[in-house]
Regions:
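Conserved residues at the C-terminal ends of beta-strands
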Residues: 7, 35, 61, 100, ...
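Glycine-rich loop-to-alpha-helix module at the N-terminal edge of alpha/beta enzyme cores
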Residues: 1-55
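A glycine- and small-aliphatic-rich helix-loop capping segment at beta-alpha/alpha-beta transitions
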Residues: 50-54, 74-82, 140-145
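Beta-strand segments within the central parallel beta-sheet cores of soluble alpha/beta enzyme folds
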Residues: 13-16, 59-64, 123
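Conserved PLP-anchoring active-site segment centered on the Schiff-base-forming lysine
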Residues: 51-73
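Catalytic PLP-binding core of fold-type I/II PLP enzymes
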Residues: 118, 136-149
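PLP-dependent aminotransferase-class I/II
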Residues: 65-130, 137
Length: 149
């Protein structure tokens, strides 16, 4: 607080130092950006994925939590509550968001194929340990299967 004030919205020298250290430890990291929350990181990931791929659709694992942004609230629910967690979000916001069943690579593959005719898939969001904070674990090889698709 003494050095930079109460707002961390602007870059700070320590962000640069951290980015440099991460690049040294993980040479494949070409760019690095600090963000304020996981929600913000997921929102940025959607935007960067769409920019990088030129595609518009996002597919996410059903029941998985990826922050509170409107588009990623689809499929975020406590079992038995329908879409209670996404109340207040107009349905049109989910036009380019789909979900697939956890542990079901065939369901994901089907959605990827369909999206080839609907503007392509920009990104697939998963929780590698399983949805609902890993209370519904997925097979240990599931993330590799997603990556292969």
């Amino acid at each position: 607080m003494d050095d930079c004030g109460p707002s961390t919205g602007l870059f700070h020298p320590y962000e640069y130092k951290l980015a440099k250290k991460i690049s040294e430890c993980v040479p494949s990291v070409e760019m690095f950006r600090m963000l304020g929350s996981g929600t913000e990181a997921c929102m940025c990931a959607v935007r960067v994925a769409r920019l990088a791929t030129g595609h518009k659709n996002i597919i996410k694992m059903g029941g998985a939590y990826h922050g509170w942004s409107d588009q990623l609230a689809w499929g975020m629910r406590v079992p038995g509550t329908l879409n209670l967690q996404s109340h207040g979000v107009p349905m049109f916001v989910f036009k380019h968001t789909q979900e697939f069943f956890p542990n079901d690579l065939k369901d994901l593959e089907k959605k990827l194929i369909i999206n080839k005719f609907r503007g392509g898939t920009a990104a697939v969001f998963i929780e590698p340990c399983g949805p609902e904070s890993a209370t519904r674990p997925v097979d240990k090889d599931f993330p590799k299967g997603v990556q292969a698709l």
